[in-house]
């Protein structure tokens, strides 16, 4: 078992990790991947041993976040150890951590030699980051930012699917953080979010979101028309 139900705690018990990997790979007929961190504590990083053992167990690919459990999301991701892992094992390695722009994506791929990248927090409220990165890696050029109308339609579509999946009560509440991510840095967004948090039904929530974006559209359809602050894409609070 894991203290506090945190899987990263398993990194303190390499024998248990090995037994779990062996058991899962043996139990299923589909490829098994592993996502983990550099280790549990700074200064005691054991990812090289864990990665090698994962390969021996038959893990199909390794996704590696460039921090320890101790780091949480503090400090910066350490790509050097991801590079060392890539040099050590022969299964695909997926680099993860602090990738928040097309330029950063290219840097991480080039520096680590990773086979792919994984994006987490930077995609919150910005799902188009994937097409931006793919376009940049292919052409070396930047895509234009989505306009306000597109952001509105993407968000409303996201909410519709979220409501359908989670239902009325949970859907309304889970959606709040997503709406906050999409609207962070936009004009009057603080006031909008405070009002949005008070809404208790999915229908009303979608309505206030649509109304807010319609107000923004009255000022212009470009993101630059309505952005009022620099947004840290990795700030989830």
Q: What is each residue range found by the language model?
A:
Residues 11, 15, 31-49:
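Active-site glycine- and acidic-residue-rich loops that bind
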Residues 1-17, 67-78, 141:
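Glycine-rich tight-turn/loop motif centered on a GG-T
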């Amino acid at each position: 078992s894991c203290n506090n139900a945190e899987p990263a705690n398993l990194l303190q018990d390499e024998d248990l990790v090995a037994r779990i990997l062996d058991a899962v790979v043996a139990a299923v007929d589909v490829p098994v991947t592993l996502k983990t961190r550099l280790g549990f504590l700074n200064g005691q990083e054991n990812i090289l041993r864990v990665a090698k053992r994962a390969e021996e167990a038959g893990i199909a690919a390794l996704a590696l976040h460039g921090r320890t459990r101790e780091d949480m999301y503090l400090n910066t991701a350490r790509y050097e150890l991801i590079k060392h892992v890539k040099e050590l094992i022969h299964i695909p390695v997926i680099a993860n951590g602090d990738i928040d722009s097309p330029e950063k994506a290219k840097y991480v791929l080039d520096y680590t030699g990773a086979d792919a990248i994984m994006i987490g927090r930077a995609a919150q409220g910005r799902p188009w980051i994937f097409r931006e990165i793919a376009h940049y890696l292919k052409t070396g050029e930047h895509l234009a930012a989505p306009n306000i109308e597109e952001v509105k339609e993407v968000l409303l579509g996201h909410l519709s699917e979220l409501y359908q999946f989670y239902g009325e009560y949970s859907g309304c509440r889970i959606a709040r953080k997503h709406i906050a991510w999409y609207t962070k840095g936009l004009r009057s967004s603080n006031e909008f979010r405070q009002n949005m948090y008070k809404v208790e039904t999915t229908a009303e929530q979608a309505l206030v979101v649509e109304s807010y974006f319609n107000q923004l559209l009255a000022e212009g359809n470009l993101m630059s028309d309505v952005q009022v602050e620099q947004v840290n894409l990795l700030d989830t609070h």
